[in-house]
């Protein structure tokens, strides 16, 4: 009897990897499987009030708590401040590896052997030159074109140079050919620094430099940025290594906005150039690729160390924002920020201290000793130091998102490769909750009533000088009968006299 009772107790307390949902509208109970701490949203479709209903959906603005793929690329534990690429701690990779080796790791899953590494480096560096027509296109941009706009446009244009790489032209199954896939990886990783360097040189009005394939990846990038006429120019090794570390820690970060964009666009089976251009477009946004620039503006606004206590009080009072602190994922110190803090000291030892760094260091010290920020788990993130480093290295702020895009392309391509190999791959198709009107009947234009509350806003825009001149002219002249009507600004004679005085000639209705 006791044995039977024990069995009953075991059955009662047996752990089940399921979630039980009770629909209080119907009283029905649903059991949903739990795997890897997740439930499938499609399982909730079975929960219906009536059999003809669509079913229950999960509402999650911004995908804040939604997993859209299974991945083996990057692991993050935000509570403990852990970041790993393919299981390797970011601290070890930043200290011991190189950007190209990390790129290989992200894309192919393992660290390369010496032979694989040599071949990989050679393949990438042999694809650093860009087509002369692409160079001509870049030279056609305005002198003050933003480098990120030039990079996005050039990436997109590259898809037209390689039609054999476009599934829309060459067939949806072309990337079952791994050699063809590898070719596009070599091209994108090889040519991105060249495009970025050309965009930078374009802004400062200097001729573009050809790549030097005898140099390392980041060394070659700095060479293309800074070489003047020297035949043997070589960037300083401290700067090269610092940039390599920056590239390593920016190479991937799980499903951030731009990487999620890569997966969404790539789910259509579009070519990787178009997908990378879309991802770079997402990174261009100030909430993604522009956060480190916002940190610099904050530090410059603080001005001196003496102003920091006042600034911190204003942050607590919600009068100021503390940029570079806190993260959507990390609830402890961002491991990338720890690495960059060391890199910052290396750069300053070579180039001299930046006054902003002194402000940043004191701001961090005071914030991390204040219970207000500790209780809210606000710690420095990667953007807090990256902008200071880039500025100290002499990069203008409009190059910051470009410097983010070059290394992040390795992560984008890793996710592209993984996604195309996923047997569960389907085109992304999020759902919406429709909140608008229904069952409206079409009303002829003459019978419609103007909605006064927004009639002036729907088509409003800033007026250019062209618009203002046209508006005044259309008020002044009646082109149909040649009459010049009175306007709110004055009579015909007053307006005519004003215009005649400005242009020094008589105005007639036919002079237009």
Curated annotation (Swiss-Prot):
One of its GO terms (biological process) is glyoxylate cycle. The gene is gltA. InterPro entries: Citrate_synth-like_lrg_a-sub, Citrate_synth-like_sm_a-sub, Citrate_synthase, Citrate_synthase_AS, Citrate_synthase_sf, Citrate_synthase_typ-I. This is Citrate synthase. CDD domains: AthCS_per_like (cd06115). Residues 483-512 are annotated as: Disordered. One of its GO terms (cellular component) is mitochondrial matrix. It comes from the Eukaryota. Belongs to the citrate synthase family. GO terms for molecular function: citrate (Si)-synthase activity. Pfam families: Citrate_synt. The active site is at 288, 327, 383.
């Amino acid at each position: 009897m006791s044995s039977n009772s024990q069995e009953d107790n075991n059955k009662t307390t047996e752990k089940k990897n399921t979630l039980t949902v009770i629909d209080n509208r119907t009283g029905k109970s649903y059991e949903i499987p739990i795997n890897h701490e997740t439930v499938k949203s499609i399982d909730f479709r079975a929960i219906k009030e009536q059999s003809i209903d669509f079913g229950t959906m999960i509402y999650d603005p911004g995908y804040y708590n939604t997993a859209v793929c299974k991945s083996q690329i990057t692991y993050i534990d935000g509570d403990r401040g852990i970041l790993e690429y393919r299981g390797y701690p970011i601290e070890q990779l930043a200290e011991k590896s190189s950007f190209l080796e990390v790129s290989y790791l992200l894309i192919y899953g393992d660290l390369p052997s010496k032979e694989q590494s040599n071949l990989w480096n050679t393949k990438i560096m042999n694809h650093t030159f860009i087509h002369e027509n692409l160079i001509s296109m870049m030279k056609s941009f305005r002198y003050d074109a933003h480098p990120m706009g030039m990079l996005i446009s050039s990436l997109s244009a590259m898809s037209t140079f390689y039609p054999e790489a476009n599934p829309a032209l060459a067939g949806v199954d072309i990337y079952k050919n791994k050699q063809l896939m590898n070719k596009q990886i070599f091209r994108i990783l090889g040519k991105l620094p060249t495009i970025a360097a050309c965009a930078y040189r374009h802004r400062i009005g200097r001729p573009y430099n050809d790549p030097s394939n005898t140099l390392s990846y980041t060394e070659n990038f700095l060479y293309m940025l800074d070489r003047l006429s020297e035949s043997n120019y070589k960037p300083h090794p401290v700067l090269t290594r610092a940039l390599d570390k920056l590239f390593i820690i920016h190479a991937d970060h799980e499903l951030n906005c731009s990487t999620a964009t890569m997966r969404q666009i790539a789910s259509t089976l579009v070519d990787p150039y178009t997908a990378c251009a879309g991802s770079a477009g997402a990174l261009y946004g100030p909430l993604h690729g522009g956060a480190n620039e916002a940190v610099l503006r904050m530090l410059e606004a603080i001005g001196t160390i003496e102003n920091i206590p006042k600034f911190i009080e204003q942050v607590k009072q919600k009068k100021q924002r503390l940029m570079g602190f806190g993260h959507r994922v990390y609830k402890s110190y961002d491991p990338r920020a720890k690495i960059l803090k060391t890199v910052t000291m290396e750069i300053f030892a070579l180039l001299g201290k930046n006054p902003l760094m002194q402000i940043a260091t004191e701001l961090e010290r005071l914030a991390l000793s204040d219970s207000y920020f500790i209780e809210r788990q606000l710690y420095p993130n990667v953007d807090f130091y990256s902008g200071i480093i880039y500025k100290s290295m002499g990069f203008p702020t409009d190059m910051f998102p470009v410097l983010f895009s070059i290394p992040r392309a390795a992560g984008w391509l890793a996710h592209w490769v993984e996604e195309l190999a996923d047997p569960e791959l389907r085109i992304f198709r999020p759902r919406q909750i429709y909140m608008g009107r229904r069952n409206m009947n079409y009303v002829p234009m003459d019978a419609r009533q103007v909605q006064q509350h927004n009639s002036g806003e729907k088509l409003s825009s800033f007026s250019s000088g062209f618009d203002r001149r046209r508006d005044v002219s259309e008020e002044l002249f009646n082109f149909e009968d040649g009459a010049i009507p009175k306007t709110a600004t004055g009579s015909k004679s007053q307006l005519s006299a004003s215009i005649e005085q400005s242009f020094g000639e008589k105005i007639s209705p036919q002079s237009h």
